[in-house]
Amino acid sequence: TAYRRQRQMCIRDSSGGVQRMMMDGLFGFDENMQIIPMLATSYEANDEATEYTIHLREGVSFTDGTPWNADALIANVNKWADKSLGLKRTTFLCNVLDHAEKIDDYTVKIYLSQSFGAFISNLAHPATLIMSPKQIEAGEDACAQAPVGTGQYKFVEWVAGDHMKVELNKDWWGYDADVCGGTALADADAGFKSITFKPVAESATRVSAIQAGDAQIMWSVPTESVDTLKGDSNVSVGMGDSIAVWYFFMNTQKAPFNDVKVREAMAYAINKEAYIQVVMNGYGSVATSMVGEEVQHYKGNDPYSYDPEKAKELLKEAGYPDGFTTTLMYSNTTANQKKAEFYKQQLSEVGIDLELNGMENAVLNEKVQGADCAGADAEVDCYLSGWSTSTGDADWGLRPMLATESEPPMSYNISYYENEKVDQLLKDGLATADEDRRGEIYAEVQDTVWKDLPLLCIASDKNIWATSNNITGVYLLGDGSIGMRNARMAAE
């Protein structure tokens, strides 16, 4: 049958989607990045968002035969909360965990040390995918090198730097409509007998592989290759909106960016539509918030128009009639160099001399994200980067970049933005499990920072993938991770 064919894939940096094939979470995402129940069926939270009662799906087993139940969840909660393991993403997401209590075989109550209204969305993040208790007992190396979950596919082998192979789990609970509560997550004939994932960094090599038939699924497709692949009768190209947003950070604790008029001038000086055409080859959209439109509690605002004359007026009002010189730090990839040069050209039109300082990631991270000093003493003036709100909730797209407590080296507030009102709103958004109230709070945060401009929200990408034209059911989620629950090969 069609799904028994072995498939090979070229991937770049999409481990979250691959992990989701082998392991399910308590919650997950549908194709539109909306949260859906997976190994949980439902939950209740107290008003203070400090206690969450999770009801578990029955009739599920791990691929090693271990049953999925309350004991299995508690083993995973204990693992997430164990900071001695050094699981940076997991411990950051779950650093409010206190303990978990077994109510019955399929009910667990999780107690938090403080209010955390975004807890359920964090349980949909790849960092909280569920691992077999047997594998957890075997140690962290075993978990990292041979994951065992309840997923649609089972781990087979991993050769560092070369490939990872998985095979179909025909007993996956997602095929069973009764276990799923009425509607199966995947059709009975969906899936491939095995999949080999090959990380391929060079875009041209990935494109050649899909055209030659050496790979049957490829992501992500570089925008400059879209037309080429669309013109290939053996290849199908898919496209969807991304929740990732590209930013231009400005250090608000250093002159001249400690003046909001200067930051506003920067916003008017950059032509976002031109950015999409020049940098993204037309495959993008102008950002209207710090978070993508599919993110829970997104609130859009009108983009700043391209108005270089207004930018010059604002610079004059701020005391910089002749502009100024500043430095942009960024990872020196080909794509980032193109972005940096675009910004340099745009800002030169209003008298701002943007010196470019691209560097290797390790050096950049040490200088910027690893800086352990006050913002006024930090080396960074401006910084080029982006963010994907991978929990699907506005908290994760705002707090790491805006909270005073998120300044380096703690997190990603590279603008060194300090606003007591915003700090309190971010705390308020976590202090309740009422999603309507959280929506109001995060709308106010987004409106406030749109005026304060600690960073410029430039554009969002399109997620682009390609497959052999006899394969269907492949897609990319808004966070860029691969989705293949109903993927299959057409009958031959």
Show which residues each predicted segment covers.
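Long beta-strand-rich cores associated with HINT superfamily self-processing modules
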Residues: 465-492
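Periplasmic-binding protein-like
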Residues: 228, 253-294, 338-339, 449-457
